[in-house]
Amino acid sequence: MATSPDMLCSFCPAPFKEFFETVTNMKFDEEPNYAKLISLFDGLIESPASRPIRIDEALKVGQKRGRSQVNHEEDGQHKKKVRLGSPASQWISVYNARRPMKQRYHYNVADNRLQQHIEKGNEDGLYISCVASSANLWALIMDAGTGFGSQLYEISTVFLHKDWIMDQWEKSFYITAIAGASNGGSLVVMSKGTPYTQQSYKVSESFPFKWINKKWKEGFHVTSMATAGNRWGVVMSRNAGYSEQVVELDFLYPSEGIHRRWEHGYRITSSAATSDQAAFILSKPKRKPVDETQETLRTSAFPSNHVKDKWAKNLYIASICYGRTVS
């Protein structure tokens, strides 16, 4: 964190500082000791007999920032957390070092304008590499480095249209990019020429961490993610080219976690965010890239000017999403 506990809690009683330090220093999947945290404030309030507040249920809670697993629906999903205040949403763009290539972006694209942009890109030898959505409009990244042979897409009023996806699977197309809109709709891109041999996807009211864990054990890795409102869509594929994969999920942009993963050879390969949470999939590729440089950028508006600066350094958009970054 940029602001120290001393500064934030300088005018607060000592227990507040200790509480703050404990919580902010917890690990991603560490379960809080609620009894200990609550006991910090015993000296500041009246005895339990004079305060009619039940804390026994709080002691049973097993979550920190929605990270541990609880029983919810059939999948043991994270329960949604409600926080006060006005969260800020931004564009989160991820850039990878690549050999010089042609890349093109479009943003604030309405449904009826999407086809002309895609057709023009295809004519120029470009295929869609990633998509995103903000305010029910689409952002589209197309480039010459996908390796795809052909590509299909569908805009649907439902989030990840199952029948259409299954029809394309039958034709040996695989999902290569997805985006969800706040109105519940989605844009799904499926391609030929991928290394994938099998795919599975899940739509969930909360981040499907338990399902991801299950699929990891079956040899799948996350290859695409998106959100529609507060719903999550995650696509996992076999033969994705990764040896290991981890998740960073937080109410804020997890800068420290991402940098720590970078130091251990991971790179961001998927990202998605709701108005409440941001999730990043970081993977270790089986084949180490020649240049492992990766940068991220957070901007209030679509980063059109920044993209051109990145291109000048041979850094190209690899992932982009719009959602929660700061409280």
Where are the model-predicted features located?
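Terminus-proximal functional modules
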Residues: R65, G76-S327
